[in-house]
């Protein structure tokens, strides 16, 4: 019986070659599109899921208006994180980051002095590694960024600067500051599925503009992340609505975007 079905199907395909080719091609293209879209969606949904408290972490955005122009930016003024934590019990903690831009770094390895232009530099608050729980291969996440002249490297960066030798305790000199920064920890290389990509971390306290504008609500250069308490995270929409209803700053209203 089944053999006859296949024979009939084959005869129909041969008899109607053009329509058969169109139908089979359409089916193949459709299946390929579904597969590609599924792979894309799965990849997008995998970003930042490895963070322990991913469901409680939100990035603070500014929804504002200048003249007739409406804008939304993913950066805030330096005081925003502390203000949220101090005024809203739903906010357990916060951390901030600042992108300094490319930096010429001088270093010495095996007696040979070299310089490189570093593009993967990120300035962060001292609690950054505890907030996001990036895994370390050397050093202490609780203290490695406490020093104003501390620097943390990824494994890739450590190898670039110091080869196979341990980088802990060694120094990098940032051309802008002319000051040695001591390597205090080494991170595992950042996963591709992380929206936060960097190779070196330094303390925001070492950045002159951050200190200069620490009071400013309209110096929108800091990426601010907040972590809701477990109770608030159980109903994050309600908790965030309470915060949004009560706070409005400078040029616009705070908004949040989840990881």
PLM region spans:
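Short, conserved clusters of charged catalytic residues that mark active-site
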Residues: 4-8, 39, 75-80, 153-156, ...
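Membrane-proximal extracellular/periplasmic loop immediately following the first transmembrane helix
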Residues: 37-104, 217-231, 235-240, 256
């Amino acid at each position: 019986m089944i053999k006859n079905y296949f024979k009939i199907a084959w005869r129909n395909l041969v008899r109607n070659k053009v329509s058969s080719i169109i139908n089979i091609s359409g089916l193949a293209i459709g299946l390929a599109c579904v597969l590609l879209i599924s792979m894309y969606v799965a990849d997008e949904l995998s970003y930042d899921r490895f963070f322990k408290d991913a469901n409680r972490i939100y990035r603070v955005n500014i929804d504002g208006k200048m003249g007739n122009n409406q804008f939304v930016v993913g950066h805030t003024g330096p005081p925003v994180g502390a203000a949220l934590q101090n005024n809203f019990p739903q906010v357990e903690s916060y951390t901030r980051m600042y992108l300094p831009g490319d930096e010429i770094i001088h270093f010495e390895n095996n007696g040979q002095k070299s310089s490189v232009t570093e593009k993967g530099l990120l300035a962060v608050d001292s609690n950054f590694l505890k907030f996001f729980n990036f895994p370390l291969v050397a050093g202490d996440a609780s203290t490695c960024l406490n020093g104003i002249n501390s620097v943390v490297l990824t494994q890739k960066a450590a190898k670039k600067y110091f080869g196979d030798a341990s980088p802990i305790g060694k120094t990098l000199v940032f051309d802008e500051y002319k000051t040695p920064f001591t390597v205090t920890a080494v991170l595992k290389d950042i996963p591709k599925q992380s929206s936060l990509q960097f190779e070196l971390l330094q303390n925001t306290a070492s950045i002159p503009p951050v200190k200069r504008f620490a009071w400013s609500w309209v110096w929108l250069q800091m990426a601010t992340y907040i972590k809701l308490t477990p109770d608030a995270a159980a109903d994050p929409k309600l908790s965030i609505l309470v915060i949004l209803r009560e706070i409005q700053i400078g040029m616009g209203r705070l908004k949040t975007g989840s990881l």
